[in-house]
């Protein structure tokens, strides 16, 4: 049975061929203006598409909600809510509308949408000016709230009747679906906060994500982006911020039937030290799971048996060890290096390698002596503390995967300095050193040498566990090995899949319990999860 939304509207499809841009509020408004002025849309048609998208998502995401209360402000966000209310009512839902302004105070397009409401629904609208004891009775039995009070044009703080409404629904059990943004949020927010905003269980935004959608932590529920008719040419961003999720498309093309392991690359994981044999083993296993054709772990002789026992599919290469059991500079002999590189496509250097001075010297010289694509992580990065100038990606492909502490050591600064402006930190280092830099943490960033930065929106606190970084290192190396001509997409895809596997884990188990290797059990699920379904792009799946 088709819902009223589908009967009444042929919703537009996405027109994006490249990465989805992340916009500021001003850029979003300019996009809407270009869509109207240059592509022949009307403001009313954009509002119709937006409201229809919200109603469609509400029907699919909250199918058991019968009594739906739609909370509308006087601006365009309220107009989107009025359109959604009309379609939900047409789909058989019991809809109640609360207006935070008198009908005659509505702006022009929202007023037009108000006039389109069926007479019975329009006549039952509750107009809220200030606290009203009748409101509680009006909202009794609500199964779902649609928050359409304030959108991208709002600037905190929130005042007036909206504050009372926020406080009223804060203690109610019914979920809240936010239209564009939870009311009270600034669309340009780049830090997590919840002060003063409506609670939210899901968010539907339009055309492209805004800064708050990727950096704000608006909800633990899903965040989706719906098309409303703006073509790609209308979406212009000066911030050069994109989203990692669209790079997942490189994994959606089936492998050729006549494929062989040689077509998918050979990864050499260089790492390990006494007590840290698990790190290169996990990276190697992750590289295999992520699709590399062959994987070899190059580790000190003393831990080779431990590493080799981790997975039967993994090959090992024994390296000469120092007096303390780490990797020795003896392995830098030209013949040894040439033998190590034979048949290898991508290097992953650093997992469990330790911080012994001799091993750090090995890492620096090894990277200087080789020209293969290389992924550097953990103590492979710490080896360049005080030597960051030697990390030069000109003439070869280098991917660095630091957490904030490792990034601070490379820069000779502090974690607080790194975290103060993560985007600028990542972008500046990537462009200066001609590397691809994966700055891990809340909303992991992938910064490219050309200045573009992709923001990742998958992942959750289950990843705050030793070994998850080693898994990511192996996945990044495997993706680069499989897609050597599409390195930017390969790295972004690996980061997205890493987080998506953790999201898949917590859908059935608790985030406290995940082991790093359990990520790999959910990797197939992450690969098969479509970026776009039900007519919307899933920026965040929710937990």
Question: Model-flagged regions — what are they?
Answer:
Residues 133, 140-157, 347-354, 444:
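Glycine-rich phosphate-binding loop
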Residues 16, 83-142:
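Gly/Ser-rich phosphate-binding catalytic loop and adjacent alpha/beta segment
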Residues 2, 6-19:
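Short, Lys/Arg-enriched N-terminal segments with co-localized hydrophobic residues
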Residues 14-102, 107, 202, 211-374, ...:
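Small-residue (G/A/S/T)-rich helix-start motifs and N-terminal tracts that mark the onset
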Residues 121, 171-174, 432-435:
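A structural motif corresponding to the C-terminal end of an alpha-helix
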